[in-house]
Amino acid sequence: MFKVIQRSVGPASLSLLTFRVYAAPKKDSPHKSYMKIDELSLYSVPEGQSKYVEEPRTQLEENISQLRHHCEPYTSFCQEIYSHTKPKVDHFVQWGVDNYNYLQNAPPGFFPRLGVIGFAGFVGLLFARGSKIKKLVYPPFFMGLGASVYYPQQAITIAQITGEKLYDWGLRGYIVIEDLWKQNFQKPGNVKNSPGNK
């Protein structure tokens, strides 16, 4: 077995060796002219120039092309709506998953507090009998009152933010009313110079 391995390794190792070969043209041979690549038969160019001719469209292809052309504005509109609504839907789904996970691992005492806050909203709905405005105001007020008992820090933060927003809205409304008042109701001294009295 050793002899077989020795014989098979010998010729394989010789194939990896490199040898230099020195070759020179014979001095008495006549000088040959070289051929260009285009002159070789392998690279011959066909004599006739090929021309691409497009096949005429069939009636089905023409109808599909017209349908695609007419539907393009609608498809682009749908793609635009999809690109705008997909992040919002993903955000809403993630919000739902987060709330579900929170409710699955709720802190102790969360559900009794939630029941008291919901009951406060129901009591507000009972007190609001008769008036539609009371039905809109009383339940959120009672629920907010119940929530502020259990979550005072969050209630203070929400009250501050709400107060700032209400003040900002009131200031904007005052400015708008003041501008409208100045435009529509001028002082009595300016009545002579108004464009209507010429």
Curated annotation (Swiss-Prot):
A Gene Ontology biological process in which this protein takes part is: cristae formation
Residues of the signal peptide = 1-23
Q: Which residues form a coiled coil?
A: none
> Which residue ranges traverse the bilayer?
108-128
InterPro entries with a match to the protein in the record: MIC26/MIC27, MIC26/MIC27_animal
Q: Which GO terms describe its cellular component?
A: cytosol; endoplasmic reticulum membrane; extracellular region; Golgi membrane; MICOS complex; mitochondrial inner membrane; mitochondrion
List glycan-bearing residues.
N63
Q: What does this protein do?
A: Component of the MICOS complex, a large protein complex of the mitochondrial inner membrane that plays crucial roles in the maintenance of crista junctions, inner membrane architecture, and formation of contact sites to the outer membrane. Plays a crucial role in crista junction formation and mitochondrial function. Can induce cardiac lipotoxicity by enhancing mitochondrial respiration and fatty acid metabolism in cardiac myoblasts. Promotes cholesterol efflux from macrophage cells. Detected in HDL, LDL and VLDL.
Q: What is this protein called?
A: MICOS complex subunit Mic26
